[in-house]
Design a protein with these regions (language model features):
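C-terminal catalytic "cap/lid" subdomain
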Residues: 2-313
Length: 313
């Protein structure tokens, strides 16, 4: 019997511009439809780090060019824009791949809002990298001219960082559940979801943040009662002592083992750390649930237990 699977797809895996994204989504669709062909129900969430940064940069340039005509675009609106154009390409690539294999299954992208706590400490400690990589000189210019917060990102260059509060709940969850139950392939929680918080009455207000897609996918997986959460990354398995002579790749982890390795500092913040933390949270959320961290092209083999790092009780 097939499983209900939530797949967390990284924004970096979608390329840094539109032509790259159109190529990347075709490979993504093939790997996802491999799972659907095996009889699994699949819900896809995705990141938007490079894309939302690109959108905000473009909107900021527009405001600077004609400030009397164009007001600054809120970060929450930029996230919504990224959901639209990434979802558009993903949805069409999935539809095409399904039809190429004679699988009659609808695909739908849900514009998804995710509730956050406006008092989350993350708003005072920005950690989420967005946008393109910069040189040290470019980063210094962004800090001095625009007041951006910038960090060095995993030795690959410098990036802007923004607030990344923990997701609390998914506003459109019932619609997502209904679509899954109706047999649709659903794309949801794009870019971690549009960050919102509740104000007076039933009003939702956008927050200046980008939610981590791994944590949002964990909440999504719990709320759709998934069996498995697959977090895709740039390596086939999780490693301890990564990049060192005594590097060790892990086939499986218990939550307690994962916490031990987290405490020892084996996983980099903003990179593998949130993936492992989200995987542990999901694995502990109910009996029988498991998470898998692996490469996109290894997802099918990972579900079959042939590769990847499995996290389970």
């Amino acid at each position: 019997m097939g499983k209900r699977i939530v797949i967390a797809l990284g924004g970096n895996a979608l390329g840094s511009n539109l032509p790259e994204q159109m190529i990347a989504v075709k490979q993504t669709a093939k790997a996802i439809v491999d799972l659907i062909e095996e009889g699994h129900e699949v819900i896809i969430a995705h990141g938007n780090g490079p894309q939302v940064g690109m959108i905000q940069k473009a909107m900021a340039e527009l405001t600077r060019s004609e400030p009397e005509k164009y007001i600054p675009c809120p970060l929450s609106v930029c996230v919504a824009m990224s959901q639209g154009y990434i979802g558009y390409d993903l949805q069409n690539a999935l539809r095409e791949e399904l039809l190429d294999r004679s699988i009659q299954k609808g695909v739908a992208t849900v514009l998804t809002q995710v509730e956050v706590d406006p008092n989350d400490e993350a708003f005072h400690n920005p950690t989420k990298p967005i946008g393109a990589f910069m040189t040290k000189e470019e980063a210094d210019k962004m800090v001095s001219e625009r007041g951006y917060n910038v960090i060095e990102d995993a030795g690959r260059g410098y990036r802007r960082v923004v607030a990344s509060p923990r997701p609390q709940s998914i506003i459109e969850i019932q619609s997502i559940r209904d679509m899954v139950e109706a047999g649709l392939v659903v794309v949801a929680c794009g870019g971690g979801g549009i960050p919102v918080y509740k104000t007076e009455g039933h009003h939702l207000k956008g927050a200046a943040a980008v939610i981590d897609k791994d944590f949002a996918s964990c909440v999504l997986a719990q709320q759709v009662e998934a069996d498995t959460l697959i977090i895709l990354t740039a390596v086939e398995k999780v490693a301890i002592n990564f990049g060192k002579p005594d590097e060790k790749w892990l086939d499986s982890l218990t939550p307690d083992e994962a916490r031990k390795y987290i405490g020892e500092g084996h996983f980099a913040p903003g990179s593998m750390l949130p993936k492992v933390e989200a995987a542990v949270e999901f694995a502990e959320s109910a009996p029988g649930r498991s998470a898998l961290i692996t490469l996109l092209e290894k997802a099918k083999d990972g579900v079959a237990g042939k590769t990847g790092t499995a996290i389970h009780q």
